[in-house]
From Swiss-Prot:
<keyword id="KW-0863">Zinc-finger</keyword>
<dbReference type="Pfam" id="PF00104">
    <property type="entry name" value="Hormone_recep"/>
</dbReference>
<dbReference type="InterPro" id="IPR013088">
    <property type="entry name" value="Znf_NHR/GATA"/>
</dbReference>
<comment type="function">
    <text>Orphan nuclear receptor.</text>
</comment>
<feature type="domain" description="NR LBD">
    <location>
        <begin position="203"/>
        <end position="463"/>
    </location>
</feature>
<dbReference type="GO" id="GO:0003700">
    <property type="term" value="F:DNA-binding transcription factor activity"/>
</dbReference>
<dbReference type="GO" id="GO:0008270">
    <property type="term" value="F:zinc ion binding"/>
</dbReference>
<dbReference type="GO" id="GO:0005634">
    <property type="term" value="C:nucleus"/>
</dbReference>
<protein>
    <recommendedName>
        <fullName>Nuclear hormone receptor family member nhr-79</fullName>
    </recommendedName>
</protein>
<keyword id="KW-0479">Metal-binding</keyword>
<keyword id="KW-0539">Nucleus</keyword>
<dbReference type="Pfam" id="PF00105">
    <property type="entry name" value="zf-C4"/>
</dbReference>
<keyword id="KW-0804">Transcription</keyword>
<feature type="DNA-binding region" description="Nuclear receptor">
    <location>
        <begin position="3"/>
        <end position="81"/>
    </location>
</feature>
<keyword id="KW-0805">Transcription regulation</keyword>
<dbReference type="InterPro" id="IPR035500">
    <property type="entry name" value="NHR-like_dom_sf"/>
</dbReference>
<dbReference type="InterPro" id="IPR001628">
    <property type="entry name" value="Znf_hrmn_rcpt"/>
</dbReference>
Amino acid sequence: MVRGKCMVCDSPNATNYHFGAQSCKACAAFFRRSIAMDQCYECLGDGVHSCKIDHTLRLNCRHCRLKKCQKAGMMRDLVQAKREIKSDKGKNSRNSSQSEDFFSPPPEQPGPSNYFDQFPWQASENEMDPYPSSPKIRKMSENLMGIDELQQFIQIPAGVDDFPDIFTDSDEIRSRMTSISEASAYVTGMEEEERLFGLAGLYTEQVINLNMRRRITYTDRLLGSVFDAPCVCPYDKADLKLFDHRTYRQKNRNDYTMILDYINRFPEFESLSKSEKTVLFRTAAAVDVLLDQSYYSQVIFPTEDVLVTANGEYLPMNPMPKVENQRDSGNFHSDEDYDRFKMLTSMKVRQWLHVCEPMKKLDMSLAEFSLFKALTIWHYNYYKLQCTGKQICSRQRDDIFRTLLLICDDEGHDSALIRASEIVLAVGIAMAEVHEMVTSYIEITVYDVLDDPILKDMLKFQY
């Protein structure tokens, strides 16, 4: 398959012309949604200069993305024509395979509480059709009134001759009601897509804000530089400092403030009790340590084996650092100095092998990573909260999973379900390493290798 460059977002995965312009499947789907729902977006920039539209940040400014679609040559009339053809097929042949694929409700899927108990499941052949694909749309037609039930509520006046013949033709009535039901399901499905894209935008924005604050805290950049572009990663290679076990602190008080700001905007966070908020906050702090360093390592060193910590330090992993039998190497001031080096470096090596390398192979986009991080936090806490908190966790992880399917399709993966499956399965990797990391830190504090009152307070929590 010949691939070109998308004229909208510069993605290298433009395989065809969509609505009159060479574009990737993601931008084509965005244009279709925007025109079909007659959406009007507000520019996130200054309103004078167009925002940058890049395939790594498609969710940033939808106003400028839509303008760029139209500038590239996409035509709204082609979207309308496509919808009319679908509607005609629905009228003339209820059994048309294309009509059913477009409008029919998806097969029943596991509910929010058992997504992860029954995952993965087998997808039907048509399940991943991206225009629109079944996993994106809830079963919209469940509550639509059936034709027989509807006829009980329709009272045709005695002077039926005064009405057009169309209302005396039951087949035509059935056909028109079918068309209305299908159109209703289509519009409702598009509205649900829009809600889920908004959720993806929220989590992505929170990660970008966290990155901006880290850039201010841990680099020598000018303050104005944080507004140059959305902060996909807080560091460049020039910003990094070599990992030093003597000065290394996993987090300081500013870091915990950043995490609190990050988690405060999670949907339904305010509905949790005080103790449940504390649990979610502690978990977010632990997950942030593991996942953000894996993402930074992937972005800054995509082809090199280098671990980048959340506070902007780097540790080469090829060859692996030697930690055993180094006490008499002459590089350490005391036994305590060596013990600190051994514990911290061993922990970083394990995190590299168990988390960073698997994450690097997944090569997640910013939107995928943002959803993955939030999903890990919510899912981890599902087993730790009370009944109401569990219900909130269940709703949020269900929403994130469906949003992840939508994003994987939007980014042009051949199989959104397989891609989302790979990302969701990595949640278990992160959860397992959280336990290992906490165990290492307990050893550090027990032996007074690291005197950190904030860390000791965090470790009172049973992860």
